[in-house]
Amino acid sequence: MPAVNLGMPKVPEVLAPRRKTRQISVGKVKVGGNAQVSVQSMTTTQTTNINATLQQIAELTATGCDIVRVAVPHQDDADVLHILAKKSQIPIIADIHFQPRYVFTAIDAGVGAVRVNPGNIRKFDDQVGAIAKAAKAAGVSIRIGVNAGSLHPSLLQKYGKATPEALVESAVWEASLFEEHDFHDFKISVKHNDPVIMVKAYRLLAERGDWPLHLGVTEAGPAFQGTIKSATAFGILLSEGIGDTIRVSLSAPPAEEVKVGLQILQSLNLRERKLEIVSCPSCGRAQVDVYSLAEQVTEGLKHVNVPLRVAVMGCVVNGPGEAREAELGVASGNGRGQIFVKGEVIKTVPEAEIVQTLIEEANRLAAEMPAGSIGSPEILV
């Protein structure tokens, strides 16, 4: 029976059509409508430290970040936004709490968008008209950022705690105020640190209007826990077509947030998949150290930036089948590895040469692809 090479699908399947929303602009990045789901992060530097902040933004840009948010807790931070907005490679969102005057400074600075928290900005409802007028004149969009940790006291009194309904009521009320002033260039987030409550809130919000939605699990936690929480919540919502831009919140370097966010989108076929390592979890049948093999191959191919699936399998049960379905793979056993390329065995090599052979073949395949970007290979054997 001839080998069937599945590899990367030519036309990726998605679980559900994207929800129809209005489209807004955050600087040069489109959000909502038919735009791809964008990935955001937030700097961890002191915003007034311009060089450090721009360096971190450059690192985020290189990682694949589309939009970056910076904290504006003080007037000094607001005063440097015009420099950051001018020099940043990607659009900047100014994150504003408590002080409404910082919103106007940010708009005048030329940022891509301003995030406002209706739960803690002083007399926010009274400021909406002026904010809408200034933002509209400057072509700056707004994010209405509702957060479970800073809901207005009246909503906490009404609902007893930060329920999905409380989050949505806050968001819809503020949206209605902006729309009363003929301002429609905004997106909404209703964040909670419990993925279940967060999912329920976004589902409710999606039913109430055509606003673009920014997905986030707030205060998700350390890298492992936060990744699980965000992947769970985002996976559910995005698979239902809900969500137009995402931020994975981790107690980790910002670039890690971007990597996780991109991987979530790639896993759902909402972004073109890049390098994908398929490796077995190992068991008593494994005849090689699969963990070490997979890690070495991953490290050695981290420079590859094309849709390439590489299977690293440790035995003959699923190994040959998985290897055939990848562009490149190895089925290991008895001190040797069968190397598959596009479904066909091209050679058998000693176990000690598996990693080097896979890296060499991956580089060759990547170079043949139109979007190939193979960088400088790093071989660990």
Swiss-Prot record:
Pathway noted in the entry: Isoprenoid biosynthesis; isopentenyl diphosphate biosynthesis via DXP pathway; isopentenyl diphosphate from 1-deoxy-D-xylulose 5-phosphate: step 5/6
Cofactor, how bound (note): Binds 1 [4Fe-4S] cluster.
Cofactor: [4Fe-4S] cluster
Keyword annotations of the record: 4Fe-4S, Iron, Iron-sulfur, Isoprene biosynthesis, Metal-binding, Oxidoreductase
Molecular-function GO terms, alphabetical: 4 iron, 4 sulfur cluster binding; 4-hydroxy-3-methylbut-2-en-1-yl diphosphate synthase activity (ferredoxin); 4-hydroxy-3-methylbut-2-enyl-diphosphate synthase activity (flavodoxin); iron ion binding
Keyword Metal-binding: yes
Binding residues annotated for [4Fe-4S] cluster, in chain numbering: C280, C283, C315, E322
Pfam families (alphabetical): GcpE
Entry annotated with the keyword Oxidoreductase: yes
InterPro entries: Dihydropteroate_synth-like_sf, IspG_bac, IspG_bac-typ, NO2/SO3_Rdtase_4Fe4S_sf
GO biological process: isopentenyl diphosphate biosynthetic process, methylerythritol 4-phosphate pathway; terpenoid biosynthetic process
Catalytic reactions of this protein: (2E)-4-hydroxy-3-methylbut-2-enyl diphosphate + oxidized [flavodoxin] + H2O + 2 H(+) = 2-C-methyl-D-erythritol 2,4-cyclic diphosphate + reduced [flavodoxin]
Superkingdom of origin: Bacteria
EC number(s) per entry: 1.17.7.3
The protein's role, per its UniProt record: Converts 2C-methyl-D-erythritol 2,4-cyclodiphosphate (ME-2,4cPP) into 1-hydroxy-2-methyl-2-(E)-butenyl 4-diphosphate.
NCBIfam families xref list: ispG_gcpE (TIGR00612), PRK00366.1 (NF001540)
Family label: Belongs to the IspG family.
HAMAP family (alphabetical): IspG
Protein name: 4-hydroxy-3-methylbut-2-en-1-yl diphosphate synthase (flavodoxin)
Organism: Clavibacter michiganensis subsp. michiganensis (strain NCPPB 382)
